[in-house]
Amino acid sequence: MVVTTTTSKFGRVLVTGSGRSLYVFTGDNFPFSAKSAIQLPCTALNKGPGKFECTAAWPPLLATGPLVARGGVRQAGLGTVTRNHVKQVTYFGRPLYRFVGDAAAGQKNGQNFAAFDGMWYLDLTSGRSAIGVSTLQTERSANGVVLASPTATPGRRTLYTLSFDGKNMTTCTGACSALWPPLLTSGRAKAGAGVSRSAIGTIRRSNGSLQVTYHGHPVYMFAFDLGAGAKPGLTNGQYLIDAAASGVWYTVLPNGRPDPGTTTVRSESSSDGKILSVTGGFNHARATLYGFTPDTARVSKCNGQCAIFWPPVLTKGRPKAGAGVSQSHLGTLRRSDGTLQVTYFGHPLYFFAQALNSGLGGDAFPAFGGIFYAVTVGGALV
């Protein structure tokens, strides 16, 4: 099996010995042992509209003989991973695929393609994905006008930020980046309709790639917006409470603020009685809500690093009362960054970033000069 290269606008990219382009898949961005049989995300069981199989659209490059590196490919980078009793070729640990949309040698129709819950890219001799210059623009969605990228094929994919990220810093790596592919670029991203060019920046990720930022916030796509046949403007990742990523995911407004939509606060049973919680995203994960002892009525003292570990419960407009909660006790306060935070009996409400999957993981937690307590439906901190 010969793996060689050809020239492209991105640099030299990997191809088969017969000149067919080779691709990598963001869904494979998780640690695995190349010696063990594993179930890779792109399988014959992963079917899109019309029961189209992922491996039918993106056939794995199988190791049919000794691996031979040519044309600048690094021999040490070639390897295999076992899948369904056959060996798939890898390059620097990432499985390689072909694309059925490439009808002839030299075609690169799978580049920057969104399908089967991930992004597909050509692979460079360095082992990094071939990324062009990305573009940011606004897109109308069910939640209103939000930030999107038209760079993917088919285009206009909604972009998200993670509450646990610091300014110009990402905390979403490894398995997280498989579910939330970062928006990458080969240089400074371009500003499309409705986007301020001065707000666009980049950060260098741990693997050396450049991720786009907007107003200092790293931006991502969501794998479940990238399925085969998925339409532009999907916001399946909106208000998603993601325990694996330690934070809350939001779509991004044109001004760079997170867009939480309208938040509904409900009650749930606990060992401390009825306490407040929020159900977030399409996965309906429940998250306990907390109050902070230094706060006063409608005044939050949790800012900066505190607000990263204890994200404020945000809302767009007046929050709604769910089961067991009185609407008259809900309110809002305007934070220093312009976002609206939900209050209950005047108490500003927070999530605990490292326990965002229900339960009282952050109860009676001393931090940042105070103590965080769960909030009862009666407004007490317990």
Regions found by a protein language model. Name each.
Residues 1-382:
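Compact beta-sheet-dominated domain cores in extracellular/mature segments
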